[in-house]
């Protein structure tokens, strides 16, 4: 299992081998038309970018990955453990019209629906069941991680589409790593309250502070939900400011990364 880097001209994005049966990507900063602090592949619609730039960025990425901009479905991310089932009727939500629902996970079993979640240090998790032909996407900030959003997305796929956890493949994308995610005690306390002693493997004390491994914590949740095929990116968004946006590093003066997954049509 591994993440792969794809380059087409100036465009760069990542994919995971475990999701090869679905069109998907984890974006980087490279290959768009946005300028300044948003240079260049900004995919966020509320970052102060020109709408035509954002649309062109989606079009460029979509041509390479295999989705159309109008197929995307966004959500209002609120650092929750809420997951919503969506379908073709929801396509365009967020890009062509406002995303109304405050949830942090999306699932579907309909081809032509490009589930889209945003990050700039938070953990993006993409899910694919090639047997039941269903997909999921979860945005896991530290609060969502503590609340088990990744496991909740797996449970939604079981409930809505009859997926078996052992058939679900998961890719945990680039986010702030344990090298850079320094926190006060509230973050590790929340993880231990949710995961017990198992959380300890992802928490490193450093004096009065702590360094926390969000990717490992989300992998723990996925394994608890019954998922065994888990691919984890080695990239830290805060360590690579030229390649990824990091809220921890630059605050609000930044663009947004996106993780996108779409079922391909059969046949």
For each of these PLM feature ranges, what is it?
Residues 1-267:
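Active-site microenvironment for binding and transforming phosphate-containing groups
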